[in-house]
Amino acid sequence: MVKYAGKCQCGAVGYEAKSEPSFVIHCECLDCKKSSGAGHATWAAFETAAVQFSGVMSRHSTIADRGGTTTREFCPTCGGRMALSYSSLSGHVLVAAGTLDDPDSIIPSLVLYNKRHTVWDHVAASLATYPAMPPRTYSEWAKSRLDEACVFASGNDTL
């Protein structure tokens, strides 16, 4: 059963997800700012096996600040960004939340890379923030409970 669906602006690329997201984040890293053209990007992470994409996407890869590969996928027709994957977050794909048919169906719980916050961009003050990535690998972080990751907002640097 499909729980979430979305598509790019022109409709050439779409997806369906058959599970709840593992986590939903706002990211204020420089890569997300550059690729979104905004102060942050919002991502819903799903297990790769739960998401089915349709249409052909173009890809652009960069090296992340921890040395892994970040691959962004987008529609070659309208340029709409669709998905993001990290080499160190195997088994997950992050879907651009703005592409969801019902973007209000998800709620971000955490802001990453808050040390790079842009003063004119506003996210809910109630969200937990972390200055960069938690000091675990992406894979370990994704497997941990999100509320454990939120302890970083209180200044505790260990999980």
PLM regions and their residue ranges:
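A short Gly-Trp-Pro
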Residues: 1-7, 12-159
